[in-house]
Curated annotation (Swiss-Prot):
Keywords: Cytoplasm, Nucleus, Protein transport, Transport. Acts as a specific nuclear import carrier for hsp70 proteins following heat-shock stress: acts by mediating the nucleoporin-dependent translocation of ATP-bound hsp70 proteins into the nucleus. hsp70 proteins import is required to protect cells from heat shock damages. It is found in: Cytoplasm, Cytosol; Nucleus. GO terms for biological process: cellular response to heat; protein import into nucleus; protein transport. InterPro entries: Hikeshi-like_C, Hikeshi-like_N, OPI10. This is Protein Hikeshi. Pfam families: Hikeshi-like_C (PF21057), Hikeshi-like_N (PF05603).
C-alpha cells in the first residue's frame, strides 16, 4: 500500500504492519538522510474519508522513543517529501504508535504511517522543520540582495561627529535603510510577488 524512498537507496515497499491501521518502515543510517519521500503505491487507495499521517521516530534522547509528525498523504495527495535532516530525538507530538519497541540499532530510525480520518489529519500540526522549503530561487535571490545591500551600506556608516560638511554629498540615516530593509523583508515573506503590483 505504501512506499518509502531515500535518495541513493532502493525504494522500500515492505512496510511492517504493526496494527490494523499502522505501518512502519525502518530507516537505517538515518543520520546521513536529508529527505524522505512517502507515497501510495497506487495498488490500494485509502478508503473513502481516510488518509495517512506520517511520523518519524529517531532513537535516543532522554525521553526514550519520540515520534514526530512530519505531515500526511491522501488519495488526492498520494506522495510527500519531508526534510528529516534537522530532526533529532527531542520533543515529539501525540502519536498513535503507543509504546512500540524503539529501533534496536542506534542509527536506525523509523517512518510510521497511521491511517486516520481526513478531518483528524487537517487538525494536526507537523514539526515545522520537516517541511521542504518552498522558497523559489527568485525569493532566495531577493533576500540575498537585501542582505548584501544592507551590509554594504552599513559598512560606510559614520557618526555625525565623524562627518565633514560636503554640499555635494547626500547622507541617508542608517535607521532609514534598516527600516526599509525590515519592511521589504516582511512584505516578501507575506507575498513573494508583492513587487508585481
Amino acid at each position: 500500500m505504501f512506499g518509502c524512498l531515500v535518495a541513493g537507496r532502493l525504494v522500500q515497499t515492505d512496510a511492517q504492519q504493526v496494527a490494523s491501521d499502522k505501518f512502519v518502515f525502518n530507516l537505517p543510517d538515518y543520520e546521513h538522510v536529508n529527505h524522505v519521500v512517502v507515497f501510495l503505491l497506487g495498488t490500494v487507495p485509502f478508503p473513502e474519508g481516510l488518509g495517512g499521517a506520517v511520523y518519524l521516530c529517531v532513537p535516543g534522547g532522554a525521553a526514550g522513543q519520540v515520534w514526530q509528525l512530519l505531515g500526511f498523504i491522501t488519495n488526492e495527495k498520494p506522495s510527500a517529501i519531508f526534510r528529516i535532516s534537522g530532526l533529532k530525538a527531542g520533543e515529539g507530538s501525540s502519536h498513535p504508535f503507543g509504546m512500540m519497541d524503539a529501533p534496536a540499532a542506534p542509527s536506525m530510525a523509523q517512518v510510521g504511517v497511521s491511517v486516520e480520518g481526513l478531518h483528524l489529519l487537517a487538525q494536526q500540526t507537523p514539526v515545522s522543520s520537516s517541511a521542504v522549503s518552498t522558497l523559489d530561487s527568485f525569493t532566495q535571490f531577493t533576500q540575498k540582495m537585501l542582505d548584501s545591500l544592507f551590509n554594504f551600506t552599513s559598512s560606510f556608516a559614520l557618526s555625525q561627529s565623524q562627518m565633514s560638511p560636503n554640499p555635494s554629498e547626500m547622507f541617508i540615516p542608517a535607521s532609514s535603510i534598516r527600516r526599509w530593509y525590515e519592511n521589504f523583508q516582511r512584505r516578501l515573506m507575506q507575498n513573494p510577488n508583492f513587487w508585481k503590483t
